[in-house]
């Protein structure tokens, strides 16, 4: 049976195109930056929301980095929460400007499945964009933890881009 050279070229083009599509989908990244606003008097609500995700991410070979302002993670709490003690790293007592900078560096490396940082103030658009780029580059998740007091929460405007843990009673 005779096939024209055009038909052969079309099938080789189709094969090459499918290889390009396959390579481009393999290289897509799934980084994520999210803010979690929680009430200081209800820290358990935040744990209920985040622990299942952190437990699942703990199954990866990568680390989990906690950038905490002053408090130190309890070894007992980490184990009781079902998080892998051998994959949890903590750096404490960072100033807010160093927290964002450290998050960007850590996310960009790809060594961490998740980077969690505490900030009292809102991110600037530039800081948020920098974090998103770093998370995409490292294929990692970043969580900005923002505590609010019960009294200030009532006057704060709700944003659809933030997770407000007090909505999950």
Curated annotation (Swiss-Prot):
What InterPro entries does the annotation carry? Cell_div_suppressor_SulA, P-loop_NTPase, SulA_CellDiv_inhibitor, SulA_enterobact
Keyword Thylakoid in record: no
Q: Which Pfam families match?
A: SulA
The alphabetized UniProt keywords are:
Cell cycle, Cell division, DNA damage, Septation, SOS response
* Taxonomic superkingdom: Bacteria
Protein induction: By DNA damage, as part of the SOS response.
Q: Where is this region: Lon protease binding?
A: 162-169
Q: Outline the segment boundaries, as ranges, of region: FtsZ binding.
A: 106-112
One GO biological process this protein is involved in is: division septum assembly
Q: Does the keyword Manganese apply?
A: no
Query: Per the record, where is site Essential for degradation by Lon protease?
Result: 169
PTM per Swiss-Prot/TrEMBL: Is rapidly cleaved and degraded by the Lon protease once DNA damage is repaired.
What is its biological role? Component of the SOS system and an inhibitor of cell division. Accumulation of SulA causes rapid cessation of cell division and the appearance of long, non-septate filaments. In the presence of GTP, binds a polymerization-competent form of FtsZ in a 1:1 ratio, thus inhibiting FtsZ polymerization and therefore preventing it from participating in the assembly of the Z ring. This mechanism prevents the premature segregation of damaged DNA to daughter cells during cell division.
Instruction: Name the HAMAP family for this protein.
Output: SulA (MF_01179)
Q: What's the subunit arrangement here?
A: Interacts with FtsZ.
Matching PANTHER family, A to Z? BLR3025 PROTEIN-RELATED, CELL DIVISION INHIBITOR SULA
Q: What is this protein called?
A: Cell division inhibitor SulA
Please report the organism this UniProt entry assigns to the protein: Escherichia coli O7:K1 (strain IAI39 / ExPEC)
- Gene label: sulA
């Amino acid at each position: 049976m005779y096939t024209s050279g055009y038909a052969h070229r079309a099938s080789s083009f189709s094969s090459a195109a499918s290889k390009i599509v396959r390579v481009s989908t393999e290289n897509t990244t799934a980084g994520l930056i999210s803010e979690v606003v929680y009430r200081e008097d209800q820290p358990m609500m935040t744990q209920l929301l985040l622990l299942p995700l952190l437990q699942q991410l703990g199954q990866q070979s990568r680390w989990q980095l906690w950038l905490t302002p002053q408090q130190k993670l309890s070894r007992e709490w980490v184990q009781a929460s079902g998080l892998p003690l051998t994959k949890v790293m903590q750096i404490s007592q960072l100033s807010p400007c160093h927290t964002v900078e450290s998050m960007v560096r850590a996310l960009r490396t790809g060594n961490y499945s998740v980077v969690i940082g505490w900030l009292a103030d809102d991110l600037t658009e530039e800081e948020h964009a920098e974090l998103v780029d770093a998370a995409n580059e490292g294929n990692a998740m970043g969580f900005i933890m923002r505590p609010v007091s019960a009294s200030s929460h009532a006057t704060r405007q709700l944003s659809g881009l933030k997770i407000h843990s007090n909505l999950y009673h």
